[in-house]
Amino acid sequence: SSDDICRATIKDFRVYWAKEGPFPVMIPEPNSEALGLILKNLSEPDVERLNYYELGFDYVLAPTYVETHAGQIEVSAYFCNRSDMATTKLWSFNDWLSDHSEIQYLAAQEFLDFFGTKFGDTAQVMYNSILKRAEVFVSESSAPTSALEFGPDMKTNIQVEELKREYLGFFALNQVDLKYPFFDNSTSGVKSRTILMGSEASLILPYDPILDKVLLVEQFRIGPFCRGDKAPWVYEPVAGLIEFGEKPEDAAKREVFEEAGIQVTNLVKINSGYPNPGEATTYFYNYIGIVDLSDYSPGIYGVRDEGED
């Protein structure tokens, strides 16, 4: 209620955008002030959930004094644990609200769904992946429908009865109980579907038009191995996940350099789409990458921290 929220000002602090994402950090700064809200009458579970969300991002909860319309009072506030977390750009709540709030809300929702579960610590480690899933969902939900996309509107015709977050690791696994329309305008009963929550990826075939040669990489793949393939080292185009806030074409160029040690001079988009829509949300952006292979020597590349070889 309105009685549980009030405005407050903290002296000798200022709020900046964080370096690591679209969120605020409060930094000591003499003769400045920061505006905020006080939340009163929080329950113990409320505080535990707030601590789970904030403390995992290198914040600390500490007592401090703030000014309100009723005078000075003592509160607990979340402060960043390192001064190097902040950029030099002053925080704007209105900019955050218009540009980032929808993504942050969805990411926080997924993140907090893992509170109190065996995946609680994993969620903090994998938060950028959670952010990326939220970014993709917001982008897809707001994108205009093309002339080639048929079928009823998703939001008005597909009813989600229950969403269960079954697993979180490098990817996530959800179970969705839902109803959806048939082409004869009838509606299905409640169906349970298990879905691998993948991400977006750029797939690039490096090509030298002068030599008329392509470049492939060979690497171990868990899919063939778990299928029983005796030779799970496969030849394939360069591919890699698109990071949060990264453009597909930038990811394509980055991946070619990381996995093959060569620069792309030009990208030609082939198409984009779902490689396996019945099992995963993964979405590929497919490119031809123009390269110069005249002096290229095969070698061992990849990011070792990611287990690439």
Task: Mark where each language-model region is.
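Acidic, metal-coordinating catalytic segment for phosphate/diphosphate chemistry
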Residues: 166-211
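Conserved hydrophobic/aromatic beta-strand scaffold that supports enzyme active sites
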Residues: 38-39, 61-63, 173-175, 216, ...
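Unchanged
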Residues: 190-191, 200-203, 238-309
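A short, polar/proline- and glycine-enriched secondary-structure boundary/capping micro-motif
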Residues: 48, 58-61, 86-88, 215, ...
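Glycine-aromatic micro-motifs
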Residues: 2-155
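N-terminal strand-loop-strand
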Residues: 194-237
